[in-house]
């Protein structure tokens, strides 16, 4: 594939996203809420329709041609996902509804059966609730103890503090790869290496990295990795869990029912092979097949191309926001190193929801709230924040429109100039 020129990336792909070709309140839609969910290219939408119009049947359960075609398409995606993250085998890819379900699968199947009173789980203060609440539930049941890595002076993962938390009691390190609030890129490879030296297992939440960065689970050497399809151009209702094959083999099923069995008797059952023993019931067939189309789309663009273009956008966004004195920005400045294509902020004297409502009047979609990171916001003494998050179909011109709307919002709520 010929590498796309970075400045032309958005211009090349925007025509693939029908939803972007609309107006909101008389203004062109500027979609800057990609950390919540991405938009879907036409190729993904067409794959959904093709399945329902041509191949709609249950998988693994029929000899007729519709079922055969559906099964072949469904299982082919497992190979694509494995290749996308450089897993050793498609047997290491488990379909889930989303990353939340994937984390809960590990928490209940592995955590409940391997953790005991006094064992320690290390996570961070920046975690999404989906990578915190399940482990709180496990800790409450098993007596395990949660330990939290704090932020450094750049409001990033404090590696030195992490090192002080590791001990022979550490059994699990579960961390977000990229914070959906701070935008910091955590050193997953180094975290995994240090955790393994202490004898702990490692789970990586890749929801914010899988859509934006090349991923290599063998290089990271994590034991599990989770991601949601809807953040990487796929439909809602589909995600995946990667797990090292030998670890998944040792884990009992999370759900029971059809598909996950080998044989069933009146008094017992035997489980099926990997990865099907974790996939009870009729799966999200159409969504999984469409996930494959999304993976194809991202692969064709090139994850390095996507990342490089977004780096340019991130610097442009951060530079513009940094010139507004009323803002309190969260997370590391990109001039200090790699960070994700998002910016969370608060405006002095304004509620984040008011900011989001005002820029929406100009057709600009951003997120307001706590972004499922309430504990992190409490550290900042903030009830929430506004967040603008980018993807490869966004442009500098859209960032300019957002900055203009934000500045107009600040002027609207202020009788005269003010500073923090």
Curated annotation (Swiss-Prot):
GO terms for biological process: cysteine metabolic process. Its cofactor is pyridoxal 5'-phosphate. Keywords: Pyridoxal phosphate, Transferase. It comes from the Bacteria. It catalyses: (sulfur carrier)-H + L-cysteine = (sulfur carrier)-SH + L-alanine. The modification N6-(pyridoxal phosphate)lysine is found at residue 231. One of its GO terms (molecular function) is cysteine desulfurase activity. Catalyzes the removal of elemental sulfur and selenium atoms from L-cysteine, L-cystine, L-selenocysteine, and L-selenocystine to produce L-alanine. Belongs to the class-V pyridoxal-phosphate-dependent aminotransferase family. Csd subfamily. PANTHER family: CYSTEINE DESULFURASE, CYSTEINE DESULFURASE 1, CHLOROPLASTIC. This is Probable cysteine desulfurase. The lineage of its organism: Bacteria, Bacillati, Cyanobacteriota, Cyanophyceae, Synechococcales. The gene is csd.
């Amino acid at each position: 594939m010929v590498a796309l020129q970075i400045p032309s990336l958005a211009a090349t792909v925007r025509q693939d996203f029908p939803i972007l070709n609309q107006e909101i309140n008389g203004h062109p839609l500027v979609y800057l809420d990609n950390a919540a969910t991405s938009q879907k290219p036409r190729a993904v939408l067409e794959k959904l329709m093709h399945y329902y119009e041509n191949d709609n049947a249950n998988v693994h359960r029929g000899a007729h041609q519709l079922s055969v075609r559906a099964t072949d398409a469904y299982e082919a995606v497992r190979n694509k996902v494995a290749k996308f993250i450089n897993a050793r085998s498609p047997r290491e890819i488990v379909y889930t509804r989303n990353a939340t379900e994937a984390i809960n699968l590990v928490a209940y199947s592995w955590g409940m059966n391997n953790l005991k009173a006094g064992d320690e789980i290390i996570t961070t203060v920046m975690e999404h609730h989906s990578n915190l609440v399940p482990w709180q539930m496990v800790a409450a049941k098993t007596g395990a103890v949660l330990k939290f890595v704090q932020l450094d002076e750049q409001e990033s993962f404090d590696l030195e503090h992490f090192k002080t938390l590791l001990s022979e009691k550490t059994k699990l390190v579960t961390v977000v790869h990229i914070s959906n609030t701070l935008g910091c890129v955590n050193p997953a490879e180094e975290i995994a290496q240090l955790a393994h030296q202490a004898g702990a297992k490692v789970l990586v939440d890749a929801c914010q990295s899988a859509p934006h960065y090349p991923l290599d689970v063998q290089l990271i050497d994590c034991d599990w990795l989770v991601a949601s399809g809807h953040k990487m151009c796929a439909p809602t209702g589909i995600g995946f869990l990667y797990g090292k094959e030998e670890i998944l083999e040792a884990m009992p099923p999370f759900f029971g029912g059809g598909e996950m069995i080998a044989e069933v008797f009146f008094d017992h059952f035997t489980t099926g092979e990997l990865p099907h023993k974790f996939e009870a019931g009729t799966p999200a067939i159409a969504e999984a097949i469409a996930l494959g189309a999304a993976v194809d789309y991202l692969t064709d663009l090139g994850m390095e191309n996507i990342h490089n273009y977004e780096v340019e956008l991130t610097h442009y966004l951060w530079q513009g926001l940094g010139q507004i004195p009323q803002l309190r920005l969260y997370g590391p400045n990109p001039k200090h190193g790699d960070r994700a294509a998002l910016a969370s902020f608060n405006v002095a004297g304004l509620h984040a929801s008011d900011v989001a409502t005002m820029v929406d009047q100009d057709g600009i979609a951003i997120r307001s709230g706590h972004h499922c990171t309430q504990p992190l916001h409490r550290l900042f003494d903030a009830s929430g924040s506004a967040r603008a998050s980018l993807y490869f179909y966004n442009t500098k011109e859209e960032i300019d429109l957002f900055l203009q709307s934000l500045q107009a919002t600040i002027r609207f709520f202020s009788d005269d100039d003010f500073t923090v």
